[in-house]
Amino acid sequence: MILTFYRSGSGHVTLDLPKKDWRTALHDQQGVLWVDFNETQLVEVEPLLRDTFGFHALAIDDTLRQTHVPKIDDWDDHLYAVVHSIIFDAESLAVTTHELDIFLGLNYLVTYHHQPIDAVDWLWRHVGQDRRQFERGPDYLLYLLLDVLTAAYMPAIDALDSALDDLETTVFMQPTPQTLGTIFAVKRAALHLRRIIGPQREVLNKLARDDYAVIDPKDRMFFRDVYDHLVRLVDLNETLRDLTSGSLDIYLSVSSNRINDVMKTLTIISAFFMPISFLVGFFGMNFSALPFNSPWLLAVASGAIVLTPLLMLYWFRQRGWLSSSETRSWKNVTASATMLEASEFRGNREESTQGGNL
């Protein structure tokens, strides 16, 4: 599907401009043309990009392959940029990104994507309701698109942070394989976000600071605002990754500590039965030279069997081997550390939200 929005230099607005009129629109230096290719066949897109718009062959090849991380290329009379939108599944904590290819010229904006992208749909509705946005030029439309696309990343980071908050109690009190699965899901999502928002930050940095012929210097401040948001997102995501790694370390430590407690209990039980087994085996021997027929021998053997575990229990307690205070202390320390890191993350997130509102 191909959508077009054209505002001529005289102010006349045309939707779904026929392809045969695109060249005329491109020659209107005071007009603005936006063409959106959504799930369009490659055989239909390539001739339009090559012949009608005259884009560079390498940029067209990159567009049609759809396998790139965010980047930006300057081809003098137009810019080619690759950015990614985000799709977040709150149940599985899975992050999916869709590539959006953008061409920006002095009087046109071209977008190409295989899947529907919410930011593009929003911009289409927005300019339909307020057509004055076209008066500010295609570079301002690009700013609006990137701003909405970037804002969609914050709910995903908030949801991942909430998932880690829910794990705080579980990871200490009753860690399960499901807990480990959630930790790895958050870790995978944070890693995926890092691979996208890091390069995307550099794209916005170039748009905000470099001199491009197709961007009005007065509009660079808008791209700088989006760049600031991405910087905050990168910082929050790095903190989220650190919290996830810390939660994983704590989970493994708690699990190891529980295994150690179980092994200690089993070892103590085995230690109790070792002298008892020795006594029973000794007095169960069939040597006639030993006074096994003595009437007081039963009382001696029974007393030894009862007293030996009691003496061992007293000795173990004196040595501190049966105390769990060290385990409780370790849990308190690790819990405090995790809560401190989480509070710092929430503080950074609130600052980011407040900065975005400003």
Model-derived regions: residue spans:
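Peripheral, non-transmembrane regulatory/ligand-interaction domains of membrane transport proteins
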Residues: 1-216, 221-225, 229-232, 239, ...
